[in-house]
Every structure is written in structure tokens, then in C-alpha cells.
Curated annotation (Swiss-Prot):
Residues 90-207 form the C-type lectin domain. Glycans are attached at N110, N137, N164. It is found in: Cell membrane. Keywords: Adaptive immunity, Calcium, Cell membrane, Disulfide bond, Glycoprotein, Immunity, Innate immunity, Lectin, Membrane, Metal-binding, Signal-anchor, Transmembrane, Transmembrane helix. Residues 45-213 are extracellular. The keyword Glycoprotein applies. The gene is CLEC4C. Gene3D superfamilies: Mannose-Binding Protein A, subunit A. This is C-type lectin domain family 4 member C.
Length: 213
């Protein structure tokens, strides 16, 4: 026969059971609080880190360009593409059209100081965009030259020269001594490329990659 528990023993057992339940509840609440804190801190730290990187990148470009014009890329508001003000943008690049006239070498140096190169034209679509911003009574240096005068044309950024993607005027290039390329307007053919002496001052077009922050 099992001896009957004393009331005092039952109360002590009930108290101990309640203590364990409350202890488990407190521990659970603490764990949930920690999880919530971590889930809040991680995105905050991520955003802070990304902001610091953006500011660092902006400071890097400020040595060339004190002002940037930025637009949101796609649906993610955290991704922005920027071009220096007042450069124009097309696809993944930014373009600057000079108003002053210099030799080809000085024009390339001027672009380089701004973190760019004389323009390299890769597609018909790119050329069509560029000519919308040009004046018909002016000529503009391209980043295309023939240093050896042997018709071995090369782009300043080492992009391979592809004769299938060129837009020379009819009959051009036509002079081995004219070792630099310009884009200009001819009433009979509209816009196209022409070879010219590199020392003859012309306007120019600079091109650089968009700045992503």
C-alpha cells in the first residue's frame, strides 16, 4: 500500500513545478528578445556598412567631379548609377563633349584628368546617341588613332578594332599621314568618321564608365 502524500509535500511539488514552468517561459522570452535584437542589428549593420562604402566611393570620385547626377537602377532602391554633372548617360557609360579645341594628345590628356578616355564607339546605337549632342559645324576627336601610319587603327582603351563596326565616311580613311580620327557631319552622308592630322585642334568627346553606388 502506497502511503498517502502529505499536503505539505504536494504543495512543495506544485510550487517546484510552477517554478520550472515560469523559468522556461522567462528563458524563452529572453531567447526571443535576443533573436529579435540580432535580426534588427544585422540589417542595420549591413546598411551602415553599405553607406560607409558609398561615401568612400563618392569621396574617391570627388577629386575628379565635385557633383554627380544619380538615378535609381531597376527596382532596388539601394542601387544607383551616377554620372558627373553635366555629363550625359547612355547604357553603362557617361559622356562629356568639350567646347574647347585641342590637339588629339591634349584632348586625351584632358579626358584622362577627369578619369575618362576619348570616346570609344562600339555600336551603331551608341553613335546614334552621341551625335544627338553634337553640332554639325564642329568636328570631334575620337579615341581612335593610327600611331604608326600603317592603317593599324587602335582604340585608346585597347578595345580591339573591328572593321565591321566602323562608321567611316565614304573613301575614308585616305591619308597615311592623318593618324587620328574625328567624327563630323557631311551634308551628303550626315555623320561619319574621318582621318585627320593629330595636331590640328578639334573639339572632343570623353567617355567613362558609370559610377555605381
Amino acid at each position: 500500500m502506497v502511503p498517502e502524500e502529505e499536503p505539505q509535500d504536494r504543495e512543495k511539488g506544485l510550487w517546484w513545478f510552477q517554478l520550472k514552468v515560469w523559468s522556461m517561459a522567462v528563458v524563452s522570452i529572453l531567447l526571443l528578445s535576443v533573436c529579435f535584437t540580432v535580426s534588427s542589428v544585422v540589417p542595420h549593420n549591413f546598411m551602415y556598412s553599405k553607406t560607409v562604402k558609398r561615401l568612400s566611393k563618392l569621396r574617391e570620385y570627388q577629386q575628379y567631379h565635385p557633383s554627380l547626377t544619380c538615378v535609381m537602377e531597376g527596382k532596388d532602391i539601394e542601387d544607383w548609377s551616377c554620372c558627373p554633372t553635366p555629363w550625359t548617360s547612355f547604357q553603362s557609360s557617361c559622356y562629356f563633349i568639350s567646347t574647347g579645341m585641342q590637339s588629339w594628345t591634349k584632348s586625351q590628356k584632358n579626358c584622362s584628368v577627369m578619369g575618362a578616355d576619348l570616346v570609344v564607339i562600339n555600336t551603331r546605337e551608341e553613335q546614334d546617341f552621341i551625335i544627338q549632342n553634337l553640332k554639325r559645324n564642329s568636328s570631334y576627336f575620337l579615341g581612335l588613332s593610327d600611331p604608326g601610319g600603317r592603317r593599324h587603327w587602335q582604340w585608346v582603351d585597347q578595345t580591339p578594332y573591328n572593321e565591321n563596326v566602323t562608321f567611316w565616311h565614304s573613301g575614308e580613311p585616305n591619308n597615311l599621314d592623318e593618324r587620328c580620327a574625328i567624327i563630323n557631319f557631311r551634308s551628303s552622308e550626315e555623320w561619319g568618321w574621318n582621318d585627320i592630322h593629330c595636331h590640328v585642334p578639334q573639339k572632343s568627346i570623353c567617355k567613362m564608365k558609370k559610377i555605381y553606388i
